[in-house]
């Protein structure tokens, strides 16, 4: 099994501040024990599109495509301060190349887009992400750090998602960072956080669940 994750190193920037720089790494294991790849990280600032932040570059979701290649989507913050989702491709899971900016926020839905997931379902392509600092829009997006489901078509030439429909996934204040798994019987199963960091103080620390 191949595991992909965000690795963090501290770096002194040009303005003198020390920041956590985010890169992507992989490990190989059997589902229980994993060994880090000795050439980590596999994706760094040099693999980012122009203007993308190396401080906000996290949460890879990896899958194997029908063409035999590995793909992953990663949350990113562009120069405008909002969110975007980057698409990468690899033949072997260890050497990766940038493919496209799959989707751009353009300051419509919150700021940084985290924890992306991307898959095909019933003939449409679905992008899930968890935007930070969302503002209400009608009856939608009242939970601040929330959830977003974008449904549309994937342009095979530009590898960009053509948005057709967009809505929140859950209306509670604690649902965040949802991810899906494809079950052997074809079901797409979603899991997510049960506790948002903004509301942690409202829960008893000695709860039995």
Regions found by a protein language model. Give the residues of each.
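Conserved beta-strand position repeated once per blade in WD40 beta-propeller domains
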Residues: 59-61, 115-117, 177-180
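Structural secondary-structure packing elements that flank or coincide with functional cores
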Residues: 183-184
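Eukaryote-biased detector of low-complexity, proline/serine/threonine-rich segments
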Residues: 187-189
């Amino acid at each position: 099994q191949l595991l992909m994750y965000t690795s963090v190193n501290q770096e002194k920037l040009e303005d003198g501040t020390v920041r956590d720089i985010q890169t992507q790494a992989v490990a190989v294991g059997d589902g229980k024990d994993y060994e880090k790849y000795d050439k980590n990280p596999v994706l760094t600032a040099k693999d980012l599109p122009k203007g993308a932040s190396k401080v906000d570059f996290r949460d890879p979701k990896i899958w194997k495509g029908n063409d035999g290649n590995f793909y992953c989507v990663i949350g990113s913050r562009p120069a405008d301060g909002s969110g975007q989702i980057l698409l990468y491709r690899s033949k072997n899971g260890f050497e990766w190349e940038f493919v496209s900016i799959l989707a751009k926020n353009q300051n419509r839905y919150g700021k940084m887009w985290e924890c992306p997931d991307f898959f095909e379902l019933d003939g449409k392509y679905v992008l899930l992400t968890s935007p930070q600092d969302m503002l209400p829009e009608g009856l939608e997006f009242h939970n601040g750090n929330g959830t977003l489901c974008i449904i549309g078509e994937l342009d095979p030439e530009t590898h960009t998602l053509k948005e057709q429909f967009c809505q929140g996934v859950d209306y509670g204040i604690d649902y965040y960072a949802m991810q899906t798994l494809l079950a052997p019987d074809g079901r797409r199963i979603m899991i997510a956080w049960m506790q948002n960091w903004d509301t942690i103080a409202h829960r008893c620390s000695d709860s039995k669940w």
